[in-house]
């Protein structure tokens, strides 16, 4: 029965992807029906804020994005610092320490949601609503806007206006869907209230304080926006965030909804629907491989315990919730790192070595399917690399969407693809070379190395999940992961927007018999191979020293 439920869940991922992709295309390309519904409200917003609806250059688009995001980071930073004297603080929580406020503000603006604090004890209701939830909408709206400009550039069209795209992402995508999802979560038992904690009496007569809050609205945008941060410290293992299997499946659907839809949106916007389908199918195969790997490893249990003759019919149950079970915990771990969300319904630090390797690889690749917008930019980056390598092998000038890929584009892509591993491995080396970093490690040996690398991988990929055995709420970890999140977020977005702007100016080369097609299974295979060879092998030495070595030790 459990496998039937898994198959149904997978089918739901597939069935909703195309309709959502079509809706996104109509949202950002213009639709008379949608304009009638949302247009008056959006024009009012533009009038109040003084936004002019004109086409921007790629530099203007990128500058608008960075300035708006930077302003939001500063505002929310001061909310966190001053929450102790601000209203809506029934628990009388003190203001955040400076480096923690710095880390948290960047974390949520970068759509990472790395949390070096415990949600229910670290933030007031005002900080949760005005600070955290506000950024949970703004962050994915930023990248959804940018990816639309990116696709327009690839299609040879004007990039559009960042503020217009940003507003439409909020009014036409995130607000309507999260409103409906929040109502469903409330029906499934997720609380939604501004009242303070409830004091309950336990069976043995002791008193227990049960924290609650506006959780349903928080969870809906947490998952849809690929944010991942928890209202509670336990994240989606907490019964108030994720009461049962229905809420668990709904959360996974929300996480996958936009990332899986974007290949179809892309196909329609560039006039090559078949290429969009090829990208979707290719990435789904990689996703399935990851799920099969982690599930097999977790069901086989811990090799060290198996050798002692301990029963493991349910697999490795350490760190997992009984109400979800091993299989759905494995699926959730695959989804949350494939979609770069970072929400967890099981403790990733307790996964088996190979089980923990899958989330780590998903984040290192950052393409299967990646987070809202940012992940799809990486997908196209790998697609262009695949075309470039194929062109070199047959002695032809590489072409993508009928436009020649030349030195300028490849230099930008080369810098972008190297920057991700440089952030992860460079900062990991820094942490391992100083006691400021190593003092946080709770396990010596191979697992300790994995804890460190996982933290920086999660930060660079804007995922936010963690091996929570790492004691990371220190100035060193707050500052370094904050820098990694900021750089990992904005560097690749800006460089790839420059690539799209460069391709926009090029003329379309007529297709010939010798043109390498990017809408067939051959390209799909080369695309997957490029991801594995260029992406995975970059990190292979680290994976050998970390989870693979730990696995061999346990065996």
UniProtKB/Swiss-Prot annotation:
Its main location: membrane. Pfam families: KdpA (PF03814). The chain crosses the membrane at residues 2-22, 60-80, 130-150, 173-193, 246-266, 278-298, 374-394, 412-432, 483-503, 525-545. InterPro entries: KdpA. The keyword Transmembrane helix applies. It is found in: Cell membrane. One of its GO terms (cellular component) is plasma membrane. Belongs to the KdpA family. The system is composed of three essential subunits: KdpA, KdpB and KdpC. Part of the high-affinity ATP-driven potassium transport (or Kdp) system, which catalyzes the hydrolysis of ATP coupled with the electrogenic transport of potassium into the cytoplasm. This subunit binds the extracellular potassium ions and delivers the ions to the membrane domain of KdpB through an intramembrane tunnel. PANTHER family: POTASSIUM-TRANSPORTING ATPASE A CHAIN, POTASSIUM-TRANSPORTING ATPASE POTASSIUM-BINDING SUBUNIT. This is Potassium-transporting ATPase potassium-binding subunit. It comes from Bacillus cereus (strain AH187). The gene is kdpA.
């Amino acid at each position: 029965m459990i496998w039937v439920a898994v198959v149904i869940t997978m089918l739901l991922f597939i069935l909703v992807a195309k309709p959502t992709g079509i809706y996104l295309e109509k949202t950002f390309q213009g639709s008379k029906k949608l304009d009638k519904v949302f247009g008056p409200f959006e024009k009012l917003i533009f009038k109040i804020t003084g936004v002019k609806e004109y086409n921007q250059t790629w530099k203007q688009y990128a500058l608008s994005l960075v300035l708006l995001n930077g302003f939001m980071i500063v505002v929310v930073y001061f909310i966190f610092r001053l929450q102790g004297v601000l209203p809506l603080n029934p628990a009388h929580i003190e203001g955040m320490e400076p480096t923690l406020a710095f880390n948290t503000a960047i974390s949520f603006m970068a759509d990472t949601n790395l949390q070096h604090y415990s949600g229910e004890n670290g933030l007031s209701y005002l900080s949760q609503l005005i600070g955290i939830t506000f950024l949970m909408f703004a962050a994915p709206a930023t990248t959804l806007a940018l990816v639309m400009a990116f696709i327009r550039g690839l299609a040879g069209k004007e990039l559009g206006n960042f503020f217009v795209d940003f507003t439409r992402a909020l009014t036409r995508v995130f607000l309507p869907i999260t409103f409906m999802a929040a109502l469903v979560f409330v029906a499934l038992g997720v609380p939604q209230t501004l009242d303070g904690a409830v004091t309950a009496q336990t069976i043995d007569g002791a008193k227990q304080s049960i924290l609650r809050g506006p959780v349903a609205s928080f969870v809906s945008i947490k998952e849809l926006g690929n944010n991942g941060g928890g209202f509670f410290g336990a994240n989606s293992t907490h019964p108030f965030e994720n009461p049962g299997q229905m809420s668990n499946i709904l959360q996974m659907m929300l996480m996958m909804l936009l990332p899986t839809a974007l290949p179809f949106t892309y196909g329609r916007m560039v006039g090559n629907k078949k290429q969009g389908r090829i990208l979707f199918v290719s990435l789904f195969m990689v996703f399935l491989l990851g799920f099969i790997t982690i599930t097999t490893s977790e069901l086989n249990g811990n090799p060290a315990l198996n050798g002692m003759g301990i029963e493991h019919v349910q697999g490795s149950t350490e760190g997992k919730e009984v109400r979800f079970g091993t299989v759905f915990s494995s699926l959730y771990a695959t989804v949350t790192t494939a979609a770069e969300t970072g929400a967890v319904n099981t403790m990733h630090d307790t996964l088996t070595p190979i089980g923990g390797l899958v989330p780590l690889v998903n984040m290192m690749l950052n393409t299967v399917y990646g987070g809202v917008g940012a992940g799809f930019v990486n997908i196209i980056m790998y697609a262009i690399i695949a075309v470039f390598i194929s062109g070199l092998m047959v002695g032809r000038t590489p072409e993508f969407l009928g436009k020649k890929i030349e030195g300028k584009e490849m230099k930008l892509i080369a810098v972008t693809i190297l920057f991700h591993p440089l952030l992860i491995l460079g900062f990991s080396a820094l942490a391992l070379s100083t006691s400021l970093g190593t003092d946080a490690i709770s396990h010596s040996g191979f697992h300790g190395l994995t804890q460190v690398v996982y933290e920086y991988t999660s930060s660079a990929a804007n995922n936010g999940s963690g091996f929570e055995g790492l004691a990371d709420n220190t100035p060193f970890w707050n500052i370094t992961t904050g820098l990694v999140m900021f750089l990992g977020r904005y560097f690749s977005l800006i460089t790839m927007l420059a690539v799209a702007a460069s391709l926009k100016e090029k003329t379309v080369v007529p297709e010939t018999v010798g043109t390498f097609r990017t809408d067939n299974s051959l390209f799909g295979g080369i695309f997957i191979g490029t991801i594995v060879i260029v992406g995975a092998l970059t990190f292979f030495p680290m994976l050998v020293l970390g989870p693979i070595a730990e696995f061999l030790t346990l065996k």
